[in-house]
Amino acid sequence: MPKPTSTLPFLSLLLMLSYFNLGGNLKVANGQKTWCVVNPLTRHAELLANLDYACNHVGCSQIQQGGSCFYPNTYIHHASFAMNLYYQYMGRHEVDCNFTNSGLISLSDPSSGSCTYESDGDIEGNGTSENEISETWCVVKPTTEDYMLQENINFSCNHVDCSPIKDGGSCFQPTTLMNHAAFAMNLYYQSTGRGSTSCDFRGTGLIVTRDPGYGNCTF
């Protein structure tokens, strides 16, 4: 007897298309998970402030030594993890991921390896069954290792003009691989039509709903 054809791939495609409307506005259907991550351009002092604030409200044992999310032992990962816990705990309102404009709501799961970023559902409080988002950006996953960041920069800058992240450019500061990779990846994402696959980067890209640009640095 022939085996029945699975409908899972087709259903997965339909779900993906409902989340990512290529060539138009992105629509977030109720039930789609969201996460809060830190803007890659965030300064060290702000990362510490966000980490302290979030961990004063939620348990951050997972990012302490020996915890499942201690590695990579970076402030940007630890701050993102704590900020997301706070965002989920407070009910996933947009304001719960503000953190003095240093938080970004992600439509992509920041989890990596054994470290799971919690998500209980979509953005609350909009009063509609579907939240339409007119613009999206691509940033880098907080757990991405340096060699992958550099590979993402190299790949993107082979396709787009990365002069803003070169010495003297408007996005050179802060001079971190995380910032430079996010800028280059987003430029590639925008130039290729903002398709979900254009922000994959071997699982290291995140699609976010707020402009990561800061000061004179425009994403």
List PLM regions with ranges.
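Acidic/proline-rich low-complexity IDRs
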Residues: 10-16
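Folded extracytoplasmic luminal domains of secretory or organellar precursors
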Residues: 2-3, 15, 21-219
